[in-house]
């Protein structure tokens, strides 16, 4: 099976934000005049990149992983230029909570951040509800 990658501009919308689709189910272009009016909550990644917590949610196969992979180098560069660090984990390979806890909360980058020396940007790909509860519990 050939996997095609379309280099479309992608937009983000808050979970409870307003998003307007056309009759055909397509997003009104947020960069166009009418699209800005009908989709005021829909923005490109650059607009929200500085927010302290972001979650890219959606159905399996929508391209969330590809989106993160495409942005990773730019994100790493920007974060490093600002004096921060990144920590990327693909949770698809985790079968146990213990391993996730060890690899995330025992990670040297995470431990250095916990001592308060820099801003840490954590990227968790393939976060399912079970694993999200583990992460939420330890961040409390």
Question: Language-model features: where?
Answer:
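P-loop NTPase signaling cores
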Residues: 1-140
